[in-house]
UniProtKB/Swiss-Prot annotation:
Protein name as it appears in the record: GMP synthase [glutamine-hydrolyzing]
Organism classification: Eukaryota, Fungi, Dikarya, Ascomycota, Saccharomycotina
HAMAP family with a match to the protein in the record: GMP_synthase
Any one GO cellular component localisation term in the record: cytosol
Binding site for XMP: 309, 467, 522, 528
Length: 530
């Protein structure tokens, strides 16, 4: 797919056939967009309160998500009735189906019993377009309310033991409702059902791919930035900032300026790795700033994790602004844009009907730079999920080991050194972390683990080395498995592996007397210790 600059609109939803997901606050809403994209149909999520008249594009179809409310409650959210004037297919899921019935004036009420968990779907009308090729199978229920009457113009196409209206359809209007959640993996044929809706009923083209995205996004960036404006962006050595920087390089060449700030609390050999990958390997215009002493000086005596985060965030902005001011654009141009590696989950959280979630920890980003430097924001990855960013990185030639690198927090090792952050403490955490990651890679486990690291605890423990009593510090190892980082399970290593890692750390890292392994899931714990 080749994209002409003049023909490319700013919104991705104007480039690709798009299914609009209207979110009523379900914990599963984001999974609907993920499932649709898995079979190459572009989907975008907006809050259920979205005014259809304000859309600048027309969706190929609309999905109403589930939600934790009762449609008959006084404060229940309701969809803009103009969705029915678009003449596009509509699918209501759980609360979404009840919303369709409620709009049609038919009974929705509290069920005799709530239905949470697996249920058996009985397909009553296999000729229904939505259920084409879908057999009697397990589905996932999560509801307390249910339909008590069939809306006018609809017929029953599926049932379950507790839901006589488990699936309803108005074939002439292409409007469908299902009481279960096809977006979760527990619904065995859920993906098939969603594909029936998006591809067969809505006739959406299956042209959403990273190959096509590259062409259209590069053209979009060129159109947005223009022929002379320049862009700056912070890079960290992580996958998001590297992929973002690479696509900017492909779009505008050396008019993109990447700034890497070494804050003194990075991973082992991080700065050298960033130079080698971005500057030498990917040809990105890179400025490296050694500000470790400044950051560590400002962190002196600070033990509170929130204060650490804020000090690092504010110091980063200060250093970044100073370095950006030194960049001298070519004649006739000026720096107008700031690159930020926003991903689609960040967008979803900000636009969800439920609103942004409660802040558990302050997130380290460059948002403050926009106001201070009077820059416009450019976010080339804002439509992508993490797995899509990784695929994009591979297509752009970003090295595989970087594309699949584990996440690293913005405040770096400062929040993995519990207590005061000093050069000596950082060195201990850094060396222990490097050994842990090295052994994980040797064991072929790195891609199976979502994130792994070593944290230095603010306690000391008695030990024996040689014939001498020691009283030194404790390292806690953490490794987790997760799909979305909203919940996570601890990774189960073989005992021999942990024994080897612990032995290496105690023997090779000065100042460590004991190694522990964190077996706490999220929740109740967070991934990081601070």
């Amino acid at each position: 797919m080749s994209a002409n600059i003049d023909d490319v609109p700013i919104e991705v939803s104007k480039v690709f056939d798009t299914i609009l997901v209207l979110d009523f606050g379900s914990q599963y809403s984001h999974l609907i967009t993920r499932r649709l994209r898995e079979f190459n149909v572009y989907a975008e999520m907006l809050p259920c309160t979205q005014k259809i008249a304000e859309l600048s594009w027309k969706p190929k179809g609309i999905i109403l998500s589930g939600g934790p409310y009762s449609v008959y409650a006084e404060d229940a959210p309701h969809v803009d009735h103009d969705i029915f004037k678009l003449g596009v297919p509509i699918l209501g899921i759980c609360y979404g189906m009840q919303e369709l019935a409620w709009i049609n004036g038919k009974g929705v009420a509290r069920g005799d019993k709530r239905e949470y968990g697996p249920a058996t779907l009985n397909v009553e009308d296999p000729e229904c377009a939505l259920f084409k090729g879908v057999d009697h199978s397990q589905v996932w229920m999560s509801h307390g309310d249910k339909l008590h009457a069939l809306p006018t113009g609809f017929k029953v196409v599926a049932t379950s033991d507790n839901s006589p209206f488990c699936g309803i359809s108005n074939e002439s209007e292409h409007i469908y409702g299902i009481q279960f959640h096809p977006e979760v993996t527990h619904t065995v044929q859920g993906k098939k059902l969603l594909k029936n809706f998006a591809v067969d009923i809505c006739q959406a083209k299956t042209n959403w791919s990273m190959e096509n995205f590259i062409d259209t996004e590069i053209a979009r960036i060129k159109k947005l930035v223009g022929p002379t404006a320049e862009v700056i962006g912070a890079v960290s050595g992580g996958v998001d900032s590297t992929v973002g920087a690479k696509i900017m390089k492909e779009a505008i060449g050396d008019r993109f300026h990447a700034i890497y700030v070494d804050n003194g609390v990075m991973r082992k050999n991080e700065t050298e790795s960033v130079k080698k990958t971005l500057d030498e390997g990917l040809g990105i215009n890179l400025t490296v700033v050694d500000a470790g002493d400044l950051f560590l000086g400002r962190l002196k005596g600070v033990t509170d994790p929130e204060k650490k985060r804020k000090i690092i965030g504010n110091t980063f902005i200060h250093v970044f602004e100073e370095e950006a001011a030194k960049i001298k654009p070519r004649d006739g141009s000026e720096i107008e844009y700031l690159l930020q590696g926003t991903l689609y989950p960040d967008v979803i959280e900000s636009i969800s009907f439920k609103g942004p979630s409660q802040t558990i920890k302050t997130h380290h980003n460059v948002g403050g730079l926009l106001e201070d430097m009077k820059l416009k924001l450019i976010e080339p990855l804002r439509e992508l999920f993490k797995d899509e960013v990784r695929h994009l990185g591979e297509l752009l030639g970003v090295p595989e080991d970087l594309v699949w690198r584990h996440p690293f927090p913005g405040p770096g090792l400062a929040i993995r050194v519990l207590g005061e952050v000093t050069k000596e403490q950082v060195k201990i955490a850094r060396e222990a972390d490097a050994i842990f990651i090295e052994e994980i890679k040797k064991a072929g486990l790195y891609r199976q683990i979502s994130q792994a690291f070593a944290a230095l605890l603010p306690v000391k423990s008695v030990g024996v080395m040689g014939d001498q009593r020691t009283y030194e510090q404790v390292i806690a190892l953490r490794a987790i498995e997760t799909l979305d980082f909203m919940t996570a399970d601890w990774f189960i290593f073989e005992a021999a592996f942990l024994k080897k890692v612990a032995s290496r750390i105690v023997n090779e890292v000065d100042g460590v007397a004991r190694v522990t392994y964190d077996i706490t899931s999220k929740p109740p714990a967070t991934v990081e210790w601070e």
